[in-house]
Amino acid sequence: MRPAFAVGLVFAGCCSNVIFLELLARTHPGCGNIVTFAQFLFIAVEGFLFEANLGRKPPAIPIRYYAIMVTMFFTVSVVNNYALNLNIAMPLHMIFRSGSLIANMILGIIILKKRYSMFKYTSIALVSAGIFICTFMSAKQVTVQTGLSDKDGFQAFAWWLLGIAALTFALLMSARMGIFQETLYRQFGKHSKEALFYNHALPLPGFIFLASDIYDHVVLFNKSELYQVPVIGVTMPVMWFYLLMNVVTQYVCIRGVFILTTECTSLTVTLVVTLRKFVSLIFSILYFQNQFTMWHWLGTSFVFIGTLMYTEVWKNLGTTKSELQKDDKKD
């Protein structure tokens, strides 16, 4: 029952989170900083109350290691959200971030000296090809935007290239953070809830450098049209409602993934998260009518098929950790 409940949380939380993020970004493309700050603040407060026990519970992993992890996590979060302000459409944003396997493999080979089977190299080639196709076709769409002069068109394309560079940087940084986490957990044991709290609490002072931008968007949000929240009947600016729902659904998504990791194998978790991304992508295309050609569909299929090939989820689908433990006892 718990795995099914967790899957429901992941799909409901993560998919709706993407919807509210796109609603925010479509109205104010530069709102990434205030969105990131709100998410970090909410999760930090929740963790301070329930995980850190109001600061009375000492961390299992030394703070100096969290400081390194937090620097990377903060950078990745800010850069990923800011990329939406650089002519990056939400579908491309989701597809590009789905390429984390490539970055993980590359850095795993370089840093951890890992070696992989030819099957996994093939799957990574599929993912790479899919991302390249989607990126290339998106580049063509940027260059042929209607209503833009040659100068404005070139400027839009230049900003788009900067957005691609930002996403690439965030992808590699995220993979490096994953490797760092792997080494920490190997040394100190897994403390995912604790890591979640410190990863969101420690970076909060860093938002001081983004205070001006955050304040500007607070003003913009206050000026948005009023919206009456269903059921409770409270009236508030619609942008604040979108932000509130984005933060809440982000938390639901994270909690769902956490429950899933305690109940199922990592491969099953990967499958659920991958399918969730695919559903979010489809919804974004259909509901928001984002441009998506047959080439985009081909690239998307390459990305998701390659991801499923890499994880070999069909061999472990539905296997819970308790079942694995039973099998171990039999052996």
UniProtKB/Swiss-Prot annotation:
InterPro entries: SCL35B1-4/HUT1 (IPR013657). GO terms for cellular component: endoplasmic reticulum membrane; Golgi apparatus. It catalyses: UDP-N-acetyl-alpha-D-glucosamine(in) + UDP-alpha-D-glucuronate(out) = UDP-N-acetyl-alpha-D-glucosamine(out) + UDP-alpha-D-glucuronate(in); UDP-alpha-D-xylose(in) + UDP-alpha-D-glucuronate(out) = UDP-alpha-D-xylose(out) + UDP-alpha-D-glucuronate(in). Keywords: Endoplasmic reticulum, Membrane, Sugar transport, Transmembrane, Transmembrane helix, Transport. A motif (Mediates endoplasmic reticulum retention) lies at residues 326-331. Disulfide bonds: none annotated. It is a multi-pass membrane protein. One of its GO terms (molecular function) is UDP-xylose transmembrane transporter activity. It is found in: Endoplasmic reticulum membrane. GO terms for biological process: regulation of gluconeogenesis. The chain crosses the membrane at residues 4-24, 30-50, 59-79, 92-112, 124-144, 153-173, 201-221, 229-249, 251-267, 268-288, 294-314. Antiporter that transports nucleotide sugars across the endoplasmic reticulum (ER) membrane in exchange for another nucleotide sugar. May couple UDP-alpha-D-glucuronate (UDP-GlcA) or UDP-alpha-D-xylose (UDP-Xyl) efflux to UDP-alpha-D-glucuronate (UDP-GlcA) influx into the ER lumen, which in turn stimulates glucuronidation and excretion of endobiotics and xenobiotics. Belongs to the nucleotide-sugar transporter family. SLC35B subfamily. This is Nucleotide sugar transporter SLC35B4. It comes from Mus musculus. The gene is Slc35b4.
